[in-house]
Amino acid sequence: MNLIKMSDIDLSGKRVLIREDLNVPIKDGMITSDQRLQAALPTIKSALDSGAAVIVLSHLGRPEEGKYEKKFSLEPVADYLRKNLEYPVRFVKDYLSGVDVNPGELAVCENVRFNPGEKSNDESLAKKLANLCDVFVMDAFGTAHRAQASTYGVAQYAPVAVSGPLLIRELEALNQVLKAPKKPIVAIVGGAKVSSKLSLLKQLVGMVDVLIPGGGIANTFLKAQGFEIGISLYEPDLLDEARHILILAKEKGCQIPLPTDVVVGKTFSETCPAFNKSLSNVAADDMILDIGPETIRDYVDLIHEANTIIWNGPVGVFEFPQFAYGTRAIAIAIAESNAFSIAGGGDTLAAVDLYDLNQQISYISTGGGAFLECLEGKTLPAVAILQERAKHVKTN
C-alpha cells in the first residue's frame, strides 16, 4: 500500500487533526461499549506524546444533518477521553473558524454531522476543516468507505494528509485475508438480508472454501432450495439470486452448508418459548430464530478445520438468550481456533463483547460498511485520496 503513515511525519509543535471513528453506543448519557474508543486511544496518545496540538473529529449516530441533537453529542466521548488520557482534554462545540489548542493538549470537536455539507463532501466545509491543521490524520477505518467532508474532502485540502496507525492495522489485517490467506478459508456471513450482502456473498464464493450463511440470509437460501421456513424472515425477491450463488459456489468449489436443524419460536420476542426442530419438521407458523444443536456441531467442526476465518454477522437472534446458542457456539469456536480470524460489523462486535472474546479473535475490525466493502474488493474513497496525497508528502 502506497500510504504515508503518521509515524513517518514529525508532529512536534504541529496542529494535528485526527479523524477517528468514535461512533459508540450511548444510553442515558453513558457509553455502553468503548471498543472503538479503546481502538482509537493509542493513535491519539501517540500524537500527544509527539508534542502535537491535537484536534479530534468524529461522527456519532445519524442526526439530521445541520441540526444539533443532544443525544448525538460527542460530549460523553470527550469525558471518556479525559478520564483515559494523562493530557488536558477540552470539548469544542464551535470549531469551524478555528480551535485554540496548544501542544500536549487535546480538543474534541462536536459531531461532524451537525455541520451542513458533511455527507455531501461540501468543498467549503472541507476547506474549513483543512484550515484547522498542519497535518490531517485519517484513522477512521469505519468511515473510509464514505467520501465525506471529514474523511475525504479534508484530506484533499489539508497541507499534509497521512494514514493513522489504526487505519493501517485494519488494512493490513484485511490484506492478510485478501492477498495471502492460509487455506482452508471459512467465512460466516449472518444478518437479516441477502440484499445488504449480495456483493459480498458473490465475492466470497470465489475466494473461500466454506461459506456459512446465517440468520435471515440462511432462511433465503433454505427457501430457495424448497424448504419450509414458516413465517421466518427471508427475501422473496432474491430467491433466484440465492440459487445463482449456490450454483456459482459449486462451480468455484466453495461449500455452502445449510442448517439441518433449527430453533424456532412462534413470535419474535424475548419471552417466546424456543423449540428445536429438524428442518423437515418446521411448521407453517414457525419462525426460525437460531440454528439447532446438530447444525452447531457441523459448523464448529468446519471452523476447527480452518486456517483463516472471516466472521460478519450472527447466525441467530442472539439478543434473546433462548436463540443465542448458535451465535455463542460459533463465536467460541472462532476464539478457540488457531486460525487467523478477523471479525467485523456492528452485530458481530456486540456478540464478541457479550461473550468477552475480544482478546481471542486475531483481529477485530472497527468497520461495518468499510469492512464489507474491503472484502468485496472495492477501493475505499478515503484510502484512495490518501494514496494520491502520499505521492506529494516529504517524510522524516
From Swiss-Prot:
It catalyses: (2R)-3-phosphoglycerate + ATP = (2R)-3-phospho-glyceroyl phosphate + ADP. Its main location: cytoplasm. Its EC number is 2.7.2.3. Pathway: Carbohydrate degradation; glycolysis; pyruvate from D-glyceraldehyde 3-phosphate: step 2/5. The keyword ATP-binding applies. Transmembrane segments: none annotated. One of its GO terms (molecular function) is phosphoglycerate kinase activity. ATP binds at residues 197, 319, 345-348. Substrate binds at residues 21-23, 36, 59-62, 113, 146. It comes from the Bacteria. GO terms for biological process: gluconeogenesis; glycolytic process. It is found in: Cytoplasm. Keywords: ATP-binding, Cytoplasm, Glycolysis, Kinase, Nucleotide-binding, Transferase. SUPFAM superfamilies: Phosphoglycerate kinase (SSF53748). GO terms for cellular component: cytosol. Belongs to the phosphoglycerate kinase family. HAMAP family: Phosphoglyc_kinase (MF_00145). Monomer. This is Phosphoglycerate kinase. The gene is pgk.
